[in-house]
């Protein structure tokens, strides 16, 4: 099984702890598990596009799994943007007659971008111009900037409930696997 995680949460979202791990579950079911670990981009990567991430990420990982297990068709699972990349790669593979994939599973993956939903609250021409300017100067959109937008999309869960509990009520939240990594 090849796991293709998101760029932001990385591989560990699928392997948080022994009792909260897709990797451990799959290994326990007898599968050999491979997982892409995306490196953090820098300013030198500013010109990389989706094609590059598909070719140097998804396709390179499929090649590596194929070299390790040449007689086995690959079950691939993509999470979030990793699933979007996997969808594009699988479509191209189908077009090209590349039959290395046994199955494709998508977890929280975006495939239809015609309606941005709540994200459209944060997207307008001036906001896009500001983001493009910041990305051009830094070479990338920084994780903190993306995380802030995601927090605003789920502000009751990710911002206000914690603030109310921690600061106003004086109750400390129990540690959880995700927050240990984040």
Predicted feature residues:
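Short, surface-exposed "cap/lid" segments of acyl-processing enzymes
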Residues: 1-42
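Short, glycine-/Ser/Thr-/acidic-enriched flexible segments
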Residues: 6-9, 38-41, 60, 81-82, ...
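Gly/Ala-rich beta-loop-alpha elbow adjacent to hydrolase catalytic centers
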Residues: 78-82, 86
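Short coil/turn segments at beta-strand junctions that form active-site/ligand-binding loops
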Residues: 31, 71-74
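Alpha/beta-hydrolase active-site loop
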Residues: 45-68
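Extended hydrophobic secondary-structure segments that form protein cores and membrane-embedded regions
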Residues: 2, 76-77, 104-109
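Alpha-helix capping and helix-loop boundary segments enriched in small/acidic/polar residues
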Residues: 13-17, 45-53, 76-77
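Alpha/beta-hydrolase-fold enzymes
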Residues: 67, 71, 85, 89-182
């Amino acid at each position: 099984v090849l796991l293709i995680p998101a760029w932001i949460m990385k591989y560990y979202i699928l392997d948080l702890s022994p009792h909260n791990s897709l990797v451990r579950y799959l290994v326990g079911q007898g599968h050999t598990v491979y997982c892409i670990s995306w490196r953090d981009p820098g300013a030198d990567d500013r010109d990389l596009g989706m094609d590059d991430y598909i070719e140097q990420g998804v396709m390179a990982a499929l090649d590596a799994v194929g070299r390790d297990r040449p007689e086995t068709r690959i079950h691939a699972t993509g999470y979030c943007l990793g699933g979007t990349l996997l969808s594009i790669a699988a479509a191209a593979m189908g077009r090209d007659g590349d039959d290395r994939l046994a199955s494709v599973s998508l977890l929280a993956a975006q495939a239809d971008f015609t309606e941005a939903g709540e994200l459209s609250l944060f997207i307008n021409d001036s906001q896009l111009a500001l983001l493009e300017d910041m990305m051009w100067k830094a070479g990338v959109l920084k994780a903190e900037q993306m995380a802030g937008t995601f927090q605003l999309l789920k502000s009751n869960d990710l911002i206000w409930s914690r603030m109310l509990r921690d600061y106003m009520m004086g109750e400390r939240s129990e540690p959880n696997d995700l927050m240990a990594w984040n």
